[in-house]
């Protein structure tokens, strides 16, 4: 049967697709500008929330929870968000969740005014902002779900190889699956190889194999966004 959990997932998926639909009414030059916006321009950009609701109002059959999420995904736990400065539990649950997802997506995607950040760094910033920008319990659940090194993270292993995380294992979050891209000398592999750290515990020299660190997108000339497009 179609459970409440399935319904919630459907709402979040649809809200994720539609939350910024109002930006189609924002002047493109404002969205692509690398420098800051003046107050009037900021008001215009922030109006995308109401513009999105106006567009979706013409779409019959959308769950009210989806509209709530679209309306409130820029609200923040401490009241510093927009458009209405809602605080805490006054923000609908799906809006609170979408706020976390939207923040994470913004930090890990290349933008005109900022380079994409490593997923690990974005997760840490979300954690530091818990109970200020976002509800603590939801942030911690998001991190638990994604793992310390979320899928899409570019990482270096203890033996020097570099890869992109493709899957995080629920019971072994520090031992993900990867697509290996570079060898120990940071040279591109002729063919990409899969590695499941959940079953591979040692490197070629018999030493413990671990994730050494998270790397920024573009490190060592690797564009992991391009990889997923390919």
For the regions a language model picked out, list residue spans one by one.
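Histidine- and acidic-residue-rich, metal-dependent catalytic cores
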Residues: 1-230
């Amino acid at each position: 049967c179609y459970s409440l959990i399935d319904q919630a997932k459907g709402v979040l998926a649809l809200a994720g697709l539609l939350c910024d639909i109002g930006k189609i009414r924002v002047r493109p030059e404002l969205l692509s500008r690398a420098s800051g916006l003046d107050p009037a321009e900021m008001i215009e950009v922030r109006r995308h929330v109401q513009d999105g609701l106006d567009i979706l109002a013409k779409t019959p059959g959308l769950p009210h929870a989806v509209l709530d999420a679209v309306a409130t995904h820029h609200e923040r736990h401490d009241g510093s968000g927009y458009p209405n400065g809602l605080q805490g539990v006054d923000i609908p649950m799906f809006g609170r969740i979408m706020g976390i997802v939207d923040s994470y997506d913004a930090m890990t995607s290349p933008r005109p005014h900022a380079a994409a950040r490593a997923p690990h760094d974005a997760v840490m910033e979300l954690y530091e902002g818990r109970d200020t920008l976002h509800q603590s319990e939801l942030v911690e659940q998001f991190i638990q779900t994604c793992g310390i090194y979320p899928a899409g993270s570019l990482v270096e292993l203890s033996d020097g190889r570099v890869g992109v995380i493709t899957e995080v294992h629920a019971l072994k979050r520090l031992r993900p699956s990867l697509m290996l891209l570079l060898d120990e000398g940071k040279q591109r592999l002729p063919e990409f190889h899969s590695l499941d750290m959940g079953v591979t515990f040692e490197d070629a020299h018999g030493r413990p194999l671990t994730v050494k660190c998270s790397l920024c997108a573009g490190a060592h000339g690797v564009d992991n966004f391009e990889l997923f497009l390919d």
